[in-house]
Amino acid sequence: MGTTLYSDADGIYVAWSDHRFTTPPAEQTGWTGPWHPVTIPGSFPGYWSQDVVEAMNRVAGHPGVTVKWLTAWEEGAPTLLAPTIGLHGTDWEMIPGVAEDDLANWNWWKLTKIREDVARSRPDRIVWLDDDINFDPASLAWVKELDIPVLAICPRTEHGLTRDHLDEIEAFIA
């Protein structure tokens, strides 16, 4: 089955910050190429790195890798974000479920949906990219309990994916 990579959007491709008052997080991330302000109506303010997009396009094109959106952007990720920033994610499967979120009872919709998808699709290993993983104890426990290799990456929301994160991903899928 290969590797399934589950991807959030904000805090992954969009380094969240108010770009009117801050500079891109190039120094903190290791991405020295062009950074651009996010200009998509309704999105969080921030920057996106052309280097991150190129690296993720390379990862997504790797044989045996299937990428799926797991983001509150839902349909907006493949239809708005991906084409705007040049990410080859318009054809990635989008896993809906944000309407089912129940944080008051400690039930994070993303954990529910990734569990269901892993049980259904049975990948050999998974990569989970989300800037909120480390804040959900149930997600951290689930990742440790899985009987397949897992790489869970939780970037700082204001930085997004770093060069070191992409190196980890590329080594994991190799």
Segments (PLM) and residue ranges:
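Alpha-helical substrate-recognition element adjacent to the catalytic core
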Residues: M1-D102
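C-terminal cap/substrate-recognition subdomain and adjoining C-terminal extension
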Residues: G76-A174
